[in-house]
UniProtKB/Swiss-Prot annotation:
Active-site residues, as the UniProt record annotates them: 41 (nucleophile), 43 (proton donor)
Species in which this protein is naturally found: Mus musculus (Mouse)
Taxonomic path: Eukaryota, Metazoa, Chordata, Craniata, Vertebrata
Binding residues for N(7)-methyl-GMP: 88
A Pfam short name: UMPH-1
Protein name, UniProt field: 7-methylguanosine phosphate-specific 5'-nucleotidase
Length: 300
């Protein structure tokens, strides 16, 4: 008798191969918490895409929209967005074609930010005054992973200092979290002078960002993965993990839904269409971790 996770019955859930999803979920359940790790994007994956019909800000947007950025800088950043975002999500261009454009976009944006005399002490205030929100169910998600010793690797092309501060202000920044992102580099007098390490953009979230390898080496028994993303570029986030046995890829389809649905369904095992919650992920975690929890299961 196949057991079904009831959260997968949600209207927002799309699956190209439900049978295959069932097999992967079964394997994850047999492995339990001891074998599991979660690898996730942040912006528009753990954070909300929209609330009450209004777009929510990404970690870059939070800074772009803040009062510590000059009007001229904001205008230039907006122009960059209107030029490059359509390229980022264009279904007719290959990732290889998009790559140089993404590097240009991030590099230009970071260069503009470095001209703004941004101070480290301003970050918490900027986040506190923003409209950033984590997805509904975030507390259950973060707390469940922490309580069950499941590592959460957040791989973000956003701004590490900002997203870390969001998680801290939401009071779910637990010790099981490891973040790789674009972290700000401040001068001795506390002003932003650049960004540390290799630039991370939408389409190089893979093992080429070499600082991940030692992290994954420590987790060699964590051979089962739940991967969460909202772009095609997020699909490579687990590429640096050695010895993967089972991986369940869950994609949030937030924007340009009609034109991107087929591509997402071909790429992700589970697609969540315009779903601003973590209900499905939390339901799966319950099913995997709490073997006796039959409330979440429906016999077929």
């Amino acid at each position: 008798m196949a057991e079904e996770v009831s959260s997968l019955m949600k209207a927002t859930v799309l699956m190209r191969q439900p049978g295959r999803v069932q097999e992967i979920v079964g394997a994850l359940r047999r492995g339990g918490g001891d074998r599991l790790q979660v690898i996730s994007d942040f912006d528009m994956t753990l954070s909300r895409f929209a609330y009450n019909g209004q777009r929510c800000p990404s970690s870059h947007n939070i800074l772009d929209n803040s009062k510590i950025i000059s009007e001229d800088c904001r205008k230039e950043l907006t122009e960059l967005f209107h030029h490059y975002y359509p390229i980022e999500i264009d279904p007719h261009r290959t990732i290889k074609e998009k790559l140089p454009h993404m590097v240009q976009w991030w590099s230009k944006a970071h260069s503009l930010l470095c001209q703004q005399r941004i101070q480290k002490v301003q970050i918490a205030q900027v986040v506190g005054e923003s409209t950033a929100m984590l997805r509904e169910g975030y507390k259950t998600f973060f707390d469940t992973l922490y309580q069950n010793n499941i590592p959460l690797f957040i791989f973000s092309a956003g701004i590490g200092d900002i997203l870390e501060e969001i998680i801290r202000q939401m009071k779910v920044f637990h010790p099981n979290i490891h973040i790789v992102s674009n972290y700000m580099d401040f001068s001795e007098d506390g002003f932003l002078k650049g960004f540390k390490g290799q630039l991370i953009h939408t389409y190089n979230k893979n093992s080429s960002v070499c600082e991940n390898s030692s992290y994954f080496q420590q987790l060699q028994n964590k051979t089962n993965i739940i991967l969460l993303g909202d772009s095609i570029g997020d699909l490579t986030m687990a590429d640096g993990v050695p010895g993967v046995q089972n991986i369940l890829k869950i994609g949030f389809l937030n924007d340009k839904v009609e034109e991107r649905r087929e591509r997402y369904m071909d790429s992700y095992d589970i697609v969540l269409e315009k779903d601003e919650t973590l209900d499905v992920v939390n339901g799966l975690l319950r099913h995997i971790l709490y073997q006796g929890d039959c409330v979440e299961l429906q016999g077929s």
